[in-house]
Design a protein with these regions (language model features):
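Contiguous, often N-terminal, cationic amphipathic patches that form binding interfaces
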Residues: 1-74, 83, 95, 99-114
Length: 114
């Protein structure tokens, strides 16, 4: 990101951590998810590893696109949760980094059944 004073470089981990934090604070989200390459199963990530459930792609217009892989609680409205996540992630990432978010894509990989 270029400013009048110089260039600011934001590490990819900053974006993934902010996006993961914003998503997991939304109602009905159990946590971030990752699919195992060995067995194909979806695993719930611990708080310190939630960035693994997020992928950030840098666009040619200096904006970013964010893909989120999540687990949700049983009985929640997935459409409503996804809309809430998109709004929260876009807001927190833009507010924290000053980077425009061009897209937030939510992938519900699993539903927890207690």
């Amino acid at each position: 990101m270029k400013t009048e004073e110089g260039t600011i470089a934001v590490d990819n981990a900053v974006y993934t951590n902010i996006a993961g934090y914003a998503a997991t604070n939304c109602f009905g989200v159990k946590g971030m998810a990752v699919r195992s390459m060995t067995d194909g199963l979806v695993h719930l990530l611990r708080k310190e590893a939630m960035g693994k459930g997020v992928r950030v792609t840098f666009q040619s217009d200096n904006s970013i696109a964010i893909d989120l892989h999540i687990m949700v609680d049983k009985g929640v409205n997935i459409r409503a949760i996804s809309a809430s996540i998109i709004k929260e992630v876009r807001y927190f990432v833009t507010k924290s980094t000053g980077t425009e978010v061009s897209a937030v894509n939510v992938f519900v990989d699993s539903i927890t059944i207690d």
